[in-house]
């Protein structure tokens, strides 16, 4: 039985078995020592499918896949970031249960991609339009924030805080400039 487990480990590229029985997948970036962690899966086939999806994103459709009869089809695959590659790999690996042919997995990916676009546009529409129209005078959630901007801006503010005053007055005592120290006993 142990012999079959070791043969399963070497059966798929980019897949290995953990001590506790989970199958994990990771892929090395081209011309780099860095790797992208693709996740842990219940079966070696799911982990291998995740590897295939990441391989497609990094190398294109001419790469040597674990399942050459069922290659992944990921729109915009060559232009994805690491986190997007990780997400596409997980999606492709978990779509294996639903599709016996390659087409159903593609439809699932397209659905979830369009759903995420809807959520993003919905989220963006909920944000306040800070600064639209009158730029700095409108602060959305912080009304009145800009009420004092005229009093403390420009030359008038610089004159009020001018370092040219030659004395500082504390209570009844007046100190000449520079003679007051913190530890002067």
UniProtKB/Swiss-Prot annotation:
Single annotated GO MF: transcription cis-regulatory region binding
Record-linked InterPro entries: AP2/ERF_dom (IPR001471), AP2/ERF_dom_sf (IPR036955), AP2/ERF_TF_ERF_subfamily (IPR051032), DNA-bd_dom_sf (IPR016177)
GO terms under cellular component: nucleus
PROSITE patterns tied to this protein: AP2_ERF (PS51032)
Main location: nucleus
DNA-binding region extent: 11-68
Keyword DNA-binding set for record: yes
Superkingdom to which the source organism belongs: Eukaryota
Subcellular location: Nucleus
Keyword DNA-binding in record: yes
The name this protein goes by in its record: Ethylene-responsive transcription factor ERF017
Gene name, Swiss-Prot/TrEMBL: ERF017
């Amino acid at each position: 039985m142990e012999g079959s487990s070791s043969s399963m480990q070497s059966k798929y590229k980019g897949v290995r078995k953990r001590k506790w029985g989970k199958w994990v997948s990771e892929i090395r970036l081209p011309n780099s020592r860095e790797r992208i962690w693709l996740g842990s899966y219940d079966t070696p086939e799911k982990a291998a499918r995740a590897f295939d999806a990441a391989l497609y994103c990094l190398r294109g459709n001419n790469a040597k896949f674990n399942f050459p009869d069922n290659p992944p089809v990921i729109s915009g695959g060559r232009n994805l970031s690491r986190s997007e590659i990780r997400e596409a790999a997980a999606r492709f690996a978990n779509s294996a249960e639903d599709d016996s042919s390659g087409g159903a997995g593609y439809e699932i990916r397209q659905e979830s991609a369009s759903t995420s676009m809807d959520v993003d546009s919905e989220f963006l529409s909920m944000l306040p339009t800070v600064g639209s129209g009158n730029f700095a005078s409108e602060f959305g959630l912080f009304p009145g924030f800009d009420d004092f901007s005229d009093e403390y801006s420009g030359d008038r503010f610089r004159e009020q805080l001018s370092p040219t005053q030659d004395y500082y007055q504390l209570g009844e005592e007046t100190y000449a400039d520079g003679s007051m120290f913190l530890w002067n006993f």
